[in-house]
Curated annotation (Swiss-Prot):
Keyword flag Transmembrane: yes
Mitochondrial intermembrane side: 1-35, 100-243
Cited PANTHER family: CYTOCHROME C OXIDASE SUBUNIT 2, CYTOCHROME C OXIDASE, SUBUNIT II
Binding site for Cu cation A2: C213, E215, C217, H221
Highest taxon in the source lineage: Eukaryota
CDD domains attached to this UniProt entry: CcO_II_C
Molecular-function annotations in GO: copper ion binding; cytochrome-c oxidase activity
Species in which this protein is naturally found: Brettanomyces anomalus
Entry binding sites for Mg(2+): E215
Presence of keyword Cytoplasm: no
EC category: translocase
Cofactor(s) of this protein: Cu cation
Protein name as it appears in the record: Cytochrome c oxidase subunit 2
Biological role: Component of the cytochrome c oxidase, the last enzyme in the mitochondrial electron transport chain which drives oxidative phosphorylation. The respiratory chain contains 3 multisubunit complexes succinate dehydrogenase (complex II, CII), ubiquinol-cytochrome c oxidoreductase (cytochrome b-c1 complex, complex III, CIII) and cytochrome c oxidase (complex IV, CIV), that cooperate to transfer electrons derived from NADH and succinate to molecular oxygen, creating an electrochemical gradient over the inner membrane that drives transmembrane transport and the ATP synthase.
């Protein structure tokens, strides 16, 4: 269990569950998933029980006396699924609107997808030339990886973000459609040429988070990873000064 928790911040071969959440949005998605799975397991158990009874007693006439017409049974198998759907729908809609809401961001980062790399722009900060701070992020080739770096996930210039800060991500593309997806942050947003999509995030713990382009964008589609380093506000400001 401890090993599983340690590895859940990054994609793992044959991974069977979500990566560890680092934002309220992702925490809500995981909770919704667990609730929906509870109702699905209940329904699966009920249907399996009914099928077993039908197959086990298929030679007896008595069990089928009220099977083809029974007002109580019809009411039960209509009311209970309807209640389950409502109990799944309300939390789902609340989470959907919460994820779309951009709440007074303290800073904005623009991510632009290109074949086959990402370009990040920190709109709230200027460099020494008085221009908006921006840089490009390329995947590190396999033959240049250092010990501890991840194949097809590590990049030469990661995005750096402060924790406990409301951030707005503005996503677009310059050539074809891409997709900015960061599982641990609960972010998955299309990067469309000529269109500026936005989402928000509040990273609650320091760490390194990985994502990958999730829209088929060409031959090197699998070579467009994203890497976010979440640091304290002081470390973030020190990093800004170094750029």
């Amino acid at each position: 269990m401890m090993l599983n928790n340690m590895l859940n911040d990054v994609p793992t071969p044959w991974g069977m569950f979500f990566q560890d959440s680092a934002t309220p949005n992702m925490e809500g998605m995981m909770e919704l998933h667990n609730n929906v799975m509870f109702y699905l397991c209940m329904m699966l158990g009920f249907v399996s029980y009914m099928l077993y009874n039908m197959l086990h007693n298929n030679k007896s006439v008595l069990p089928y006396k009220y099977l083809y017409h029974g007002q109580f049974m019809e009411m039960v198998w209509t009311t209970i699924p309807a209640m389950m759907l409502l109990m799944m729908a309300f939390p789902s809609f609340i989470l959907l609107y919460m994820c779309d809401e951009v709440m007074a961001p303290a800073m904005t980062i623009k991510a632009m997808g290109l074949q086959w790399y990402w370009k990040y722009e920190y709109s709230d900060f200027m460099d020494d030339k008085g221009e908006t701070m921006e840089f490009e992020s390329y995947m590190i080739p396999e033959d240049l990886l250092e010990e501890g770096q991840l194949r097809q996930l590590d990049v030469d210039s990661p995005m750096v973000c402060p924790v406990d800060t409301h951030m707005r991500f503005m996503v677009t593309a310059a050539d074809v459609m891409h997709d900015f997806a960061m599982p641990s942050l609960g972010i998955k947003i299309d990067a469309v040429p000529g269109r500026l999509n936005q989402t928000s995030a509040l990273i609650q713990r320091e760490g390194v988070y990985y994502g990958q382009c999730s829209e088929l964008c060409g031959v090197m589609h699998s070579s467009m990873p994203m890497k976010i380093e979440a640091v304290s506000l002081g470390e973030f400001l020190a990093w800004i000064d170094e750029q």
